Amino acid sequence: MSITVRYFASLRERVGRAEDHLEAAGNDTAGGVWSRAVPDQAIPDRVLIAINQEYADADHPVGDGDEVAFFPPVTGG
Amino acid sequence: MPISLHPEAFDPWALLGEYQSRLPAGGFGATAVFVGTMRDFNEGDDVRAMTLEHYPGMTEKHLQDITTEARKRWDLDDCLIAHRVGPIEPGDPIVLTAVWSAHRKAAFEACRYLMEELKHRAPFWKQETLKDGATRWVEKNTEG
């Protein structure tokens, strides 16, 4: 098992890939996952975060097997 | 199926008619409908095409959640959301929300609710292709 990290839309282009896989560290948060997965870029100000497809804050815990997604404000409809 | 994503062009009016024909006749007295269609202009620029990206799984789940919440807030007979994904062109329908209820108040209010919640929460992203072929991501929704 590991943590799946996904990026969408303009954030995917900015990061340069759609997905990462990280080993769970045991005390991960969503914001911490970003820092480990994208160490060369600060987490964007207006980023939205989803853990297992539910919206979450940056300080929300992340466990082994979780999917964490980062994306810009949504613009559907 | 009250939630659907359409990778190809879809006809909201046909979908609406077909869906309504399966609802119990005489059970509802009001149908409220919103259809969003792609414009060929945005932010002062000519727009030639657009690509709608989504988050498979999360998008459907949140559309489903929005309909469930609407049915808790208002006394509705049924509701429907259809949304286009992938490459689209000006004039193409993007989104359909529809609500059936006994009376117009719940129908109008719930239809607006479905659309506004979709705009705020459902993970879709628009990338526009401008006249000169350049692409840009739409950064925020219009005020309404």
Model-derived features: where do they sit?
Chain A
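Ubiquitin-like/PB1-type beta-grasp interaction modules and other compact soluble beta-rich domains
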Residues: 1-76
